[in-house]
Amino acid sequence: MTGAAGPAAKAHEIAVSVCRRAYARIEPALRAAVDRLPRHLALMSGYHLGWWGPGGDPAERARTGKAVRPALTFLAAEALGAPPRHAVPGAVAVELVHNFALVHDDIMDGDTTRRGRPTVWQQYGTGAALLTGDGLYVLAADTLAAPHTPRSTWAVTLLTRAMLATLHGQASDHAFTRAPWSGPGAVTLADYRRAAAAKTGALLAGATALGALLAGGGPRQVARLALFGRRIGVAFQCADDVIGLWGRQSATGKPVGSDLSEGRRTLPVIAALASGTPAGDRLAALLHRHRGRLGEAELPAALELTEAAGGRAAAEAEARRQQEAALAAVAGLPMPEHTRTELHAMAHYLTAREQ
């Protein structure tokens, strides 16, 4: 392995190690939090988190989440010289709210599988899944409000503001599906960036801000690390949009082009439609002809036109730009060199994701 592949592979290796370390740090407290829920909600929460099967059989262990957000919380705290234990409440809280959002997203999107098995609503019913998501959200706030959590009032405020911003982003994303594909009222690149900064960037910003806050950081340090999280969140969303169109089914669990077939306004398509190119015009005509709901027969042509109009390249360039802005946000912030290396690795890992 030579050239760019070498550093990229090393960054991936470091980031995966950071995430695994973060999950090992939070798992005991995460399990203790879930145990505080009513028995049936705890069962469904543990099922969603990959701890056991539908009936509570621990032998049926599924894949757990990557723990990206807790990893960022720990790194932010370590950047300011705090021991990891100071950041545990924040790391647990962001993992809980992330999973709350996933449970509810699966309902809204009608997704029937996650991490290789039925989603919570598919397994237990919509009402039960809604309660499960609600329970995870309440546990997150309760974890930060606990008496032993330092600066707990500020911590809860940070979390709830991050979630409010996330809700704004989700609402925008939902509204986008009712907008025309092109012409007056179509989703613009500026609309997309605002929604991505809220929908995905806000919680990653909350994760890094919580780590800095619980480490005793001042306003400038918290703001710098929050900006890192927000920018890398947008980069992550841009990369995710590329994967949603061209990612291999073996890696994503979804058919190639699934985002486009479901009518989602993702960055490659928005950029292609705004390109003013012949390919972009042909893509717009195709989408209008099929009212934005493309079947298997139309998808290959739509993907080819999106790429020919520069949509894929634009999304990848935006991901790189946001990644560079994230790294610039913490460039002047004093921190241990190994922590800086791990932050850089996480930035590359979240931007150059497997397709």
Predicted regions and their residues:
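Conserved N-terminal diphosphate/IPP-binding helix and adjacent helical/loop segment
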Residues: M1-V97, V103, I107-Q122, A171-V187, ...
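A glycine-biased, small/acidic residue-tolerant capping/turn segment at secondary-structure junctions
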Residues: L41-S45, T112, I243-T252, G280-L287, ...
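Short, charged, amphipathic alpha-helical segments
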Residues: S17-R20, T157, A226, A317, ...
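Alpha-helical phosphate/pyrophosphate-handling elements in metalloenzyme active cores
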Residues: L43-A93, L139, T143-A146, L189-I232, ...
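Short acidic/histidine-centered micro-motifs embedded in hydrophobic/aromatic stretches
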Residues: M44-H48, A93, G110, L158-A162, ...
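Divalent-cation-assisted or electrostatically stabilized phosphate/pyrophosphate-binding catalytic cores
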Residues: R61, R114-L136, S182-K199, A223-L227, ...
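All-alpha helical catalytic cores of prenyl diphosphate-utilizing isoprenoid enzymes
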Residues: R31, D35-R39, E60-K66, L131, ...
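C-terminal helix-coil-helix/basic helical segment that borders enzyme active sites and/or dimer interfaces
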Residues: E78-G81, G211-R220, W246-S250, A284-R289, ...
